[in-house]
Amino acid sequence: MCPARSLLLVATLVLLDHLSLARNLPVATPDPGMFPCLHHSQNLLRAVSNMLQKARQTLEFYPCTSEEIDHEDITKDKTSTVEACLPLELTKNESCLNSRETSFITNGSCLASRKTSFMMALCLSSIYEDLKMYQVEFKTMNAKLLMDPKRQIFLDQNMLAVIDELMQALNFNSETVPQKSSLEEPDFYKTKIKLCILLHAFRIRAVTIDRVMSYLNAS
C-alpha cells in the first residue's frame, strides 16, 4: 500500500475512534462456514435481552426483577430441550431419550450440509417446539397489551421477528402460529407481571439455545 493511502487509512481509523463511531459500524456478515442457526440464536439472545431490559425500566414499579418474580417455565413437562441438547459425551443413557415419542423437525437450514444424528434432530426439534410455545404466549400477551389505555409497554416486533426467523431456519415448512383468543376482560396489571415472568424465562432459554448452537458450530 502506498504511503499516502496508509496515512489516509490511519487518519480515518483515528477519526472513527475519536468520534466513537467504530462501535456503531454494521455487524459483519456471518462466516459462510458457520453453523446456520448460530447467527439466528445470537440475534435471539440479543433481542430478548433488550426487551427484558426495556420491560424492567418501563415497569419499574412492578415486580419485574429476577429476585421479585415467581419463576415459571411454560415448557416444563412439554419439551426435553435441556436433556436432548446435552453434548454426547455427557449423555449417559441415550436410550432413555430414544423411548420418547417425538416428531422430528429436520428440514430446515440448520441441518443443511450436515449429517443428522438422532440426538441433534431431537435437540433441534425440541428447540423448535420451545420457540413455538413462547411465540403463542407472546402474541397473545401483546394483543392484550395493545388494548391497555395507558399504552405503557408492547412487545418489540424485532424480537417476534427473530423468533420467527429461527423457527423458519429450524423448519422450512413452519406455519404461522395462531394466537390464543380470550373472551375474558384483560387484567393489565397481571398481564405486565406475566410479561416479566415470561421474558425472564425466555431469556434463560435463549441462553441455552445460543450455547447449543455455539457447541454445534464448534463440533
Swiss-Prot record:
Glycosylated residues, chain numbering: 93, 107
Induction of its expression: (Microbial infection) By pathogenic organisms, including Gram- positive and Gram-negative bacteria, parasites, viruses, and fungi. Down-regulated in response to enterovirus 71 (EV71) infection.
Any one of the GO BP annotations: extrinsic apoptotic signaling pathway
Keyword entries, A-Z: Cytokine, Disulfide bond, Glycoprotein, Growth factor, Host-virus interaction, Secreted, Signal
Broad class of where this protein is predominantly found: secreted
GO MF term (any one): cytokine activity
SUPFAM superfamilies in the record: 4-helical cytokines
Keyword Glycoprotein annotated: yes
Residue ranges of the TM segments: none
S-S pairs: 37-110, 64-196, 85-123
Function statement: Heterodimerizes with IL12B to form the IL-12 cytokine or with EBI3/IL27B to form the IL-35 cytokine. IL-12 is primarily produced by professional antigen-presenting cells (APCs) such as B-cells and dendritic cells (DCs) as well as macrophages and granulocytes and regulates T-cell and natural killer-cell responses, induces the production of interferon-gamma (IFN-gamma), favors the differentiation of T-helper 1 (Th1) cells and is an important link between innate resistance and adaptive immunity.
Family membership noted in the UniProt record: Belongs to the IL-6 superfamily.
Protein known as: Interleukin-12 subunit alpha
